[in-house]
């Protein structure tokens, strides 16, 4: 009872100090870079020294609840070993996990040897070290497992989308790394390398992107969402397997949530239940994704994971002209479920800019009533578009005018977000513009949990 009173007291205090920029289109003018893509000889693309040294090391959650980690890397000269040696900071006894190796071809490109190994039965809230490679080219990294799932478990997620490998991309990643909020896991909302923008989908750019992001993703998990630039369906060069490079390189624990595809799945982490959806896989009635999501939402236990977060690539609400209403078909299928199950927030990318919505829904339409305008709905999620991480150096600045009522704040700049869960009732979201100091919040808002504290948090 004392804990509940304390939470309510905190809720009352935070209710008074909500800070945000509601109903605003920012007039901030960003500086432009003359050169957009970082050249292949950039230091961030540097190949680690040594024969067959592991590179492009990255990790992601390897099970449903955070007690496993998928370790992935590439060796270029020969297969080497897919074994991972790991140990906890508290106990130096090394264990070994064995994985699998694969390769692929794409047009005239042959991949290196891609390794995926899952380490299991990890302890919660523990620092682990791990090593990959053999003999003189062994490389060592570390990560911290999440706390056990629970009602009032604090945890901080970073939000990055449409990263690419431009100079702006590098600024975004540096800002995230230097943030005083210290994100613990990245929720990545799609469009990774943009290799498909280069001649013949030059897959060398998958390798450079893997080396570029290693400085973060080798040390904390990134939760992957597939975007349109991962599709790489290119019949003109006889490449007709959708998502081929992405699927070989980036594994996710989709089977742990009874999904039949790596493009939609869920995980639990700390106090959040995170659902990843695919904007570019079938989602109509009766499709595998539709059927899975219907069952998945029923399984969410807000008494265990109070925060319900959805990730997708194409936004359902967007007031920029670019990609305007592209998410409409998915919205008509899933929005009513988001309202019914009181999803707290939906993060998307695709649009190369930032936008935060009010809590709105557009689910009242019937052919007899003509109601087709979004209305305020405190059971609905906030929709945040954060596809502004840098891509290939192009920002989407052409906005729908006048600003729709559902749009609370929007700005055509590059940046990243932070979703900082405090307890079962409150979380703080901030968006950080690249051209500000790392501690400056260009937009911020307190979230009140839709299940535990469903008061009006409009801005």
Swiss-Prot record:
Activity regulation per the record? Answer: Inhibited by compounds CC24201, CC27209, and MO07123. Inhibited by the tetraoxoanions molybdate and phosphate. Not inhibited by EDTA or tartrate.
Q: Which residues are glycosylated?
A: 108, 136, 170, 238, 423
Q: What is its main location?
A: secreted
Active-site residues, record numbering mapped to chain = 323
Q: What is its EC number?
A: 3.1.3.2
Q: Which residues bind Fe cation?
A: 162, 191, 194, 352
Homology family: Belongs to the metallophosphoesterase superfamily. Purple acid phosphatase family.
Asked whether the keyword Signal is assigned, the reply is yes
The residues that the entry says bind Zn(2+) are 191, 228, 313, 350
One Pfam entry name:
Metallophos
Q: Which UniProt keywords apply?
A: Disulfide bond, Glycoprotein, Hydrolase, Iron, Metal-binding, Secreted, Signal, Zinc
UniProt note: pH dependence = Optimum pH is 6.1.
Task: Name the coenzymes or cofactors required.
Answer: Fe cation; Zn(2+)
As one GO molecular function, the record gives: ferric iron binding
Question: What is catalyzed by this enzyme?
Answer: a phosphate monoester + H2O = an alcohol + phosphate
For this entry, the protein name equals Fe(3+)-Zn(2+) purple acid phosphatase
Name positions with the PTM Blocked amino end (Gly): 23
Q: How does it assemble?
A: Homodimer; disulfide-linked.
